[in-house]
């Protein structure tokens, strides 16, 4: 190619790139090609730990939150049934001294009526704990999140993509 042709190509924005240059960046080397590798995680050796952490976050965390919040209502309902004469024909002396049948029925009703607000509270507790513990887990493999440029405020969400 002549010198004039090179100058014309550089002026047009060619910048030395040829038609055979790859348009997309090259993929990672084979040892990094696993979908399980994330920054800070070494991939396949930590797969059982990652699965266990996901199990704890998604199964045991809600169970613990709901149990902790709903336990008082369950105890009140249990005490109401324990001291009612139709459930136990001969309630213990403590129950007879503390509650009549009307008092036991009131405990049962109070415990059952307190369940819906406590369910909402338990759901909020579970959501907040899950949100706080989410950074401890790596993102799911194969689902990249939106990228935001560092240092930009969240006023206008701008999605960045490689072009």
Curated annotation (Swiss-Prot):
**Membrane topology (UniProt):** Multi-pass membrane protein
InterPro entries per record: TMEM88 (IPR033355)
Q: The organism sits in which domain of life?
A: Eukaryota
**A Gene Ontology biological process term:** negative regulation of canonical Wnt signaling pathway
List the transmembrane segments.
Answer: 51-71, 105-125
The protein's predominant localisation is: membrane
Q: Could you tell me what this protein is called?
A: Transmembrane protein 278
């Amino acid at each position: 190619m002549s010198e004039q042709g090179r100058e014309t190509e550089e002026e047009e924005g060619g910048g030395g790139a040829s038609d055979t240059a790859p348009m997309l960046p090259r993929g990672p080397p084979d040892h990094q090609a696993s979908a399980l590798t994330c920054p800070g995680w070494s991939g396949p050796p930590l797969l059982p730990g990652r699965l266990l952490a996901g199990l704890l976050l998604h199964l045991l965390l809600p169970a613990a939150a709901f149990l902790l919040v709903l336990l008082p209502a369950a105890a009140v309902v249990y005490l109401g049934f324990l001291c009612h004469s139709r459930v136990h024909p001969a309630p213990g002396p403590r129950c007879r001294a503390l509650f009549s049948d009307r008092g036991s029925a009131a405990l049962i009703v109070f415990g059952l009526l307190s369940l819906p607000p406590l369910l909402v509270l338990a759901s909020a507790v579970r959501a907040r704990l899950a949100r706080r513990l989410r950074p401890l887990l790596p993102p799911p493999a194969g689902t990249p999140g939106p990228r935001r440029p560092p240092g930009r405020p969240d006023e206008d969400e701008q999605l960045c993509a490689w072009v």
